[in-house]
């Protein structure tokens, strides 16, 4: 599935968002057997207005034998705001963490960059193979680390949440996301299905992750302003953080 022929919103966004979107799809295509994941047609590409500015949202979704949904969302509000949002939702038959990554930028500056492989175990532990691989990564030092939100206890100890203050720090963040993705894809390929009992624990952990993410007031407020409360609720719970059955 070649993507090079499809024009993308990323061409109009901050360079780090374009680079990160390209990186995510490149690693996915390199390691995983992708097939399309079909969103409702009206939610693949959405346009609205926010405080007089045009709001555009572009969604791309895939699935694989190990992941029920791999979602890459790009959003742009006029020249004020650029957003990248990505989550990989594992199938609950596999004991895999949740990869999540967000970039928020505006007026040429990235104000927030977060990436994590978040545990689905309710005791907040990652699978041993992940713990080992992530521990072996170089320690990164960013000049402007940021504080996680109140609901941020879903994230792992390896989570990066920063305001990159230079091109060098942007490159560091991009490199770390690539490493997270490579660890994750290799972990997924090596994973075996779990027992029915373990699957129930994993489902509970994924539900906890999604319900905490749905509490993100900033995302909800932007969507409500542009499209109304009902639309925002539907988008939050069917596109961004739908709960596994």
UniProtKB/Swiss-Prot annotation:
Gene Ontology MF terms in the entry: cobalt ion binding; phycocyanobilin:ferredoxin oxidoreductase activity
Reactions catalysed, as given in the entry: (2R,3Z)-phycocyanobilin + 4 oxidized [2Fe-2S]-[ferredoxin] = biliverdin IXalpha + 4 reduced [2Fe-2S]-[ferredoxin] + 4 H(+)
Domain of life: Bacteria
Transmembrane segments: none
EC primary class: oxidoreductase
EC number: 1.3.7.5
Family annotation (InterPro entries): Ferredoxin-dep_bilin_Rdtase, Ferredoxin_bilin_OxRdtase
Annotated Gene3D superfamilies: 3.40.1500.20
Listed GO biological process terms: phytochromobilin biosynthetic process
UniProt keyword annotations, A-Z: Oxidoreductase
Purpose: Catalyzes the four-electron reduction of biliverdin IX-alpha (2-electron reduction at both the A and D rings); the reaction proceeds via an isolatable 2-electron intermediate, 181,182-dihydrobiliverdin.
HAMAP family membership: Ferredoxin_bilin_red (MF_00618)
Family per similarity comment: Belongs to the HY2 family.
Protein's name according to its UniProt entry: Phycocyanobilin:ferredoxin oxidoreductase
Lineage: Bacteria, Bacillati, Cyanobacteriota, Cyanophyceae, Nostocales
């Amino acid at each position: 599935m070649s993507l090079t022929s499809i024009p993308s919103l990323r061409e109009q966004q901050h360079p780090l968002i374009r680079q990160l979107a390209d990186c995510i799809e490149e690693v996915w295509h390199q390691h995983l057997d992708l097939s399309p994941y079909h969103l409702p047609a009206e939610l693949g590409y959405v346009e609205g207005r926010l405080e007089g500015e045009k709001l555009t949202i572009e969604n791309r979704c895939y699935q694989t034998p190990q992941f029920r949904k791999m979602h890459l969302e790009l959003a742009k509000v006029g020249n004020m705001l650029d957003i990248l949002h990505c989550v990989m939702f594992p199938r609950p038959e596999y004991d895999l963490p949740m990869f999540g990554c967000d970039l928020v930028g505006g007026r040429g500056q990235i104000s927030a960059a977060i990436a994590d492989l978040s545990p689905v175990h309710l005791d907040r532990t990652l699978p041993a193979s992940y713990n080992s691989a992530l521990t072996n990564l170089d320690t990164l030092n960013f000049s402007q680390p940021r504080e996680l939100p109140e609901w941020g206890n879903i994230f792992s100890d390896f989570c990066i949440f920063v305001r990159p203050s230079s091109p060098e720090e942007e490159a560091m963040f991009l490199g770390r996301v690539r490493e997270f993705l490579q660890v994750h894809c290799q972990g997924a390929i090596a994973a075996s299905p779990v027992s029915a009992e373990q699957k129930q624990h994993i489902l509970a952990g994924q539900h906890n992750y999604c319900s905490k993410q749905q509490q993100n007031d900033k995302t909800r407020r932007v969507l409500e302003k542009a499209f109304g409360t009902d639309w925002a609720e539907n988008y939050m719970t069917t596109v961004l953080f739908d709960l596994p059955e």
